[in-house]
UniProtKB/Swiss-Prot annotation:
Keywords: Nitrogen fixation, Transcription, Transcription regulation. This is Nitrogen fixation nifHD1 region GlnB-like protein 2. It comes from Methanosarcina barkeri. Belongs to the P(II) protein family. InterPro entries: N-reg_PII, N-reg_PII-like_a/b, N-reg_PII/ATP_PRibTrfase_C, N-reg_PII_CS. GO terms for cellular component: cytosol. It holds the Pfam family P-II. One of its GO terms (molecular function) is enzyme regulator activity. SUPFAM superfamilies: GlnB-like. Could be involved in the regulation of nitrogen fixation. Coiled coil: none annotated. PROSITE patterns: PII_GLNB_CTER, PII_GLNB_DOM.
């Protein structure tokens, strides 16, 4: 099993969720996060108003953190490539700020309610 963690634009979360749902991955964890990278705070991505004087200041000093969504999905090994392709397919704009995907091995999954382990806990 693998954990696929993606950091995506907030405005892409709905289409990402729908695309993953279409390939059978309805279970996921999504968390609003703040981060920074090469993008350095493109204001067009923000969902709230920024006062013009603060916007002017941002261009001179750079915004420290911008809103993103962190999406975590535990998948079977054979589904990792399909999940990654799906996430890239709906999030790739060829612009700085499209996000990142991380893949890590998961040793065990246990459903708390039933005690089921492994692939049974993912169903």
């Amino acid at each position: 099993m693998k954990e696929v963690t993606a950091v995506v634009r907030p405005n892409k979360m709905s289409v990402t969720k729908d695309a993953l749902d279409k390939i059978g991955y309805r279970r996921m964890t999504a968390i609003p996060v703040l981060g920074k990278g090469k993008q350095r705070g493109i204001s067009g991505e923000l969902n709230f108003y920024i006062q013009p004087k603060l916007l002017a200041k941002r261009y001179s000093t750079g915004m420290k953190y911008i809103p993103k969504r962190l999406l975590s999905i535990v998948v079977n090994d054979e589904d990792v490539d399909q999940v990654i392709k799906t996430i890239i397919g709906v999030n790739q704009t060829a612009q700085i700020g499209d996000g990142k995907i991380f893949v890590e091995s998961i040793d065990e999954v246990i459903r708390i309610r039933t005690g089921e382990k492994g692939e049974l806990a993912l169903k």
